[in-house]
From Swiss-Prot:
Source organism, top-level taxon: Eukaryota
Family indicated by similarity: Belongs to the universal ribosomal protein uS8 family.
InterPro entries, A to Z: Ribosomal_uS8, Ribosomal_uS8_CS, Ribosomal_uS8_sf
Any GO molecular function: structural constituent of ribosome
Lineage of producing organism: Eukaryota, Viridiplantae, Streptophyta, Embryophyta, Tracheophyta
Pfam families found in the cross-reference section: Ribosomal_S8
Gene3D superfamilies assigned to the protein according to its UniProt record, in alphabetical order: 3.30.1370.30, 3.30.1490.10
Protein name: Small ribosomal subunit protein uS8
Amino acid sequence: MVRISVLNDALKSMFNAEKRGKRQVMIRPSSKVIIKFLIVMQKHGYIGEFEYVDDHRSGKIVVELNGRLNKCGVISPRFDVGVKEIEGWTARLLPSRQFGYIVLTTSAGIMDHEEARRKNVGGKVLGFFY
């Protein structure tokens, strides 16, 4: 299998395990972007605890699933989004206004679209989950 995007592979394996009713999933290889994305998901309660396992290669992440994740995905290419354009992206990607999050990478770090709007920063779209 050819790895196009490590983040895409991680989110797809989580989504597939969630659909199958699994309680946990192992993601490998890991990266800092995946860990930050998982922190945003955990902050909003879409996943449980996760643990980084160092295997002296690229590392693994074991994620506890709690059954709240309906869909997650990566937006490729990573489009530039200004603060005023965030509303349009949420309307395009999410099922409703109060449901789900878009994850952005900004100059202030990786965060969801609501936090980016509060801090008044734009960035690049990484992905979404709901």
